[in-house]
Regions:
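Histidine-centered, metal-coordinating catalytic motifs and their short helical/loop contexts
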Residues: 122-150
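Short secondary-structure subsegments characteristic of cysteine-rich extracellular domains
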Residues: 156-165
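Amphipathic alpha-helical interface segments
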Residues: 1-121, 164-213
């Protein structure tokens, strides 16, 4: 029977490989840009531009796959310790806004799923909730709108980082884009310069699963 430790061990090769691909992203992007500058015809330029854009899509797919692995780990094996003071305050503020707005999409009580209220706080939300919303945005990209809970998490991230650099964004309403890599950045899992993203990922998940890896 699989437990938290065996899940982490069995998914480690995939997770580490995905982080390795992310670590190479910067070089791939730079090479794609150089190819654009060296284009000798309109046809070559169009091809190189397409390749340049595809590297961004690849980055989002890789990041989304990492979020999926983390999501399953938390959903199945995280050990909740109760909602933090920040999480409870966040819930109360959202419920206040719902009561004060006749146009609120959510008519009932807003509540964060306790299974994902785990890990260190990022702003006023626990790490598990950031994984939750990031994974759902990636997996339900084709839908017109996300559920309220997911949108609220992204709005919170957008309030913390309204104008992040390097092509990152948490704004769900500015065109149709994946935000998987931006979520990894918010989690602190993107240090490709020193290749520390995987170690940060493993440390955070080991903490919420209460295991040593």
């Amino acid at each position: 029977m699989e437990d938290a430790r065996s899940y982490m061990v069995s998914t480690a090769p995939a997770a580490e490989g995905l982080f390795g691909l992310l670590n190479n992203y910067g070089w791939r992007k730079m090479r794609a840009l150089v190819d654009i500058t060296k284009s000798r015809s309109r046809e070559e330029l169009d091809t190189h531009k397409e390749h340049f854009s595809s590297t961004d899509v690849a980055r989002e797919v890789i990041a989304g796959s990492i979020l999926q692995i983390a999501y399953i780990a938390i959903e199945r094996y995280a050990v909740p310790k109760g909602k933090s003071e920040n999480a409870r305050h966040f819930e109360s503020e959202i419920n206040r806004l719902i009561r004060e707005s006749s146009k609120a999409r959510l008519k009932g009580t807003f509540s964060l799923p306790e299974q994902f209220c785990v890990g260190r706080d990022i702003g006023h939300l626990p790490m598990g909730m950031i994984v939750y919303a990031g994974r759902n945005q990636y997996n339900h990209f084709a839908e017109d709108r996300l559920r309220v809970l997911n949108e609220v998490v992204f709005n919170h991230l957008h309030n913390i980082w309204p104008t992040p650099r390097n092509g990152l964004s948490f704004n769900l309403y500015d065109g149709k884009h994946f935000h998987s890599y931006s979520v990894l950045a918010a989690l602190g899992w993107t240090d490709s310069a020193k290749e520390l993203g995987y170690l940060a990922y493993k440390r955070d998940l080991s903490d919420v699963l209460q295991i040593e890896c």
